[in-house]
């Protein structure tokens, strides 16, 4: 609001509840409220299960906070950049343009999230030791949190793919379909949570989360294909396969670094984490370049103009209004 005032925009309240825009917003937001409620129901069930273990809710929520970091920094940045272009294409009824932008976003999201998932799986223990293990937080606690982070990380790629895919529905001003898909995801999460919790404890709840989003991502892509046509699935599959190959190198290298340096002290854990991330991501881009992945150039072409402008302005596709997504399990917009 201050920025708008500085730009000379004059704002005033208008009580026009029958305005078409207001009615549209109410209609769309109703399903979004249902989306959030479904998330909270699943979270409530999961936390009740986690409460059966000492410190279980803390372990689950702490691991979830770590898990959200790469998604929030990278995947959400891509969504913010590409979603307006998807909305613009949908507004023009340009399904080919919508499919192209969706495919582009899915491929870039996969490309940037795979190495994060690989690094989190291998570096979970030194990360937790570096940031959490002190005072009453013991080495045993660190081990459980690290295992839970690793479980969540197995679902990091499908989680980001699922949330990005929902942007296609929001671009078409459809919030009902995301609500239905989210009900499926939460039902699957609850169904998986019980057996996996009793088998593996709190880390099993993270595995249930990962499995639920893997299933939801697959179903969402099928629904999208029926709705708008094929989103260049062959090319997306090729990107996923090559990213997983490069990610395997990251996982192996970061695991060797973590084992070599160890995490017997806070500073050792910091060193293992920092060195692992630097070398791991450098290796990922080197392998991706060797595999001739076009996403390396695509990523640079997407963000380089924005960096040169100092982050000012919107994407190259021009201004457009995109409907924001619903909130995640902790109430943040995703």
Give a label for each model feature:
Residues 154, 161-195:
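Alpha-helical transmembrane segments of multi-pass membrane transporters/permeases
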Residues 2-39, 96, 226-241, 301:
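Interhelical loop/hinge segments that connect adjacent transmembrane helices in multipass membrane
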Residues 19-88, 121, 159, 250, ...:
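Transmembrane helical elements of multi-pass membrane transporters/channels
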Residues 121-155:
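Interfacial segments at transmembrane-helix termini and the short loops linking adjacent helices
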Residues 26, 61, 82, 94-123, ...:
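Interfacial transmembrane-helix starts/ends
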Residues 76-97, 163-170:
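Small-residue-rich hydrophobic transmembrane alpha-helices
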Residues 256-334:
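Membrane-proximal transmembrane or re-entrant/amphipathic helices at the cytosolic face
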Residues 1-2, 176, 186-218, 222, ...:
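Membrane-interface helix-loop junctions in multi-pass transport and translocation proteins
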């Amino acid at each position: 609001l201050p920025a708008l005032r500085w730009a000379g925009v004059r704002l005033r309240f208008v009580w026009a509840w029958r305005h078409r825009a207001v009615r549209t917003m109410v209609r769309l937001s109703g399903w979004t409220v249902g989306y959030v409620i479904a998330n909270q129901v699943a979270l409530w069930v999961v936390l009740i299960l986690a409460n059966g273990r000492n410190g279980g809710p803390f372990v689950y929520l702490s691991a979830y906070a770590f898990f959200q970091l790469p998604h929030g920094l990278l995947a959400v940045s891509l969504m913010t950049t590409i979603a307006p272009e998807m909305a613009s294409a949908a507004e023009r009824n340009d399904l080919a343009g919508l499919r192209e932008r969706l495919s582009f976003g899915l491929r870039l999201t996969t490309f940037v999230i795979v190495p994060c998932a690989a690094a989190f799986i291998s570096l979970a223990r030194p990360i937790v030791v570096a940031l959490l293990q002190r005072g009453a937080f013991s080495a045993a606690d660190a081990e459980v949190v690290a295992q839970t982070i690793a479980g969540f990380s197995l679902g990091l790629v499908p989680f980001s793919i699922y949330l990005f895919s929902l942007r296609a529905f929001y671009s078409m001003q459809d919030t009902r379909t995301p609500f239905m898909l989210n009900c499926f995801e939460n039902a699957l999460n609850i169904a998986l949570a019980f057996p996996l919790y009793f088998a593996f404890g709190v880390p099993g709840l993270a595995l249930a989360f990962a499995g639920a989003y893997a299933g939801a991502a697959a179903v969402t892509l099928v629904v999208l294909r029926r709705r708008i046509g094929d989103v260049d699935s062959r090319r997306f599959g090729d990107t996923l396969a090559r990213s997983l190959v490069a990610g395997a190198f990251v996982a192996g290298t970061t695991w060797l670094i973590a084992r070599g340096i160890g995490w017997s002290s806070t500073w050792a854990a910091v060193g293992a984490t920092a060195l692992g991330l630097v070398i791991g991501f450098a290796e990922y881009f080197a392998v991706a370049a060797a595999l001739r992945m076009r996403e390396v150039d695509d990523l640079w072409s997407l963000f380089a103009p924005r960096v040169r402008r100092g982050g000012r302005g919107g994407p190259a596709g021009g201004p457009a209004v995109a409907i924001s997504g619903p909130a995640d399990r902790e109430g943040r917009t995703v």
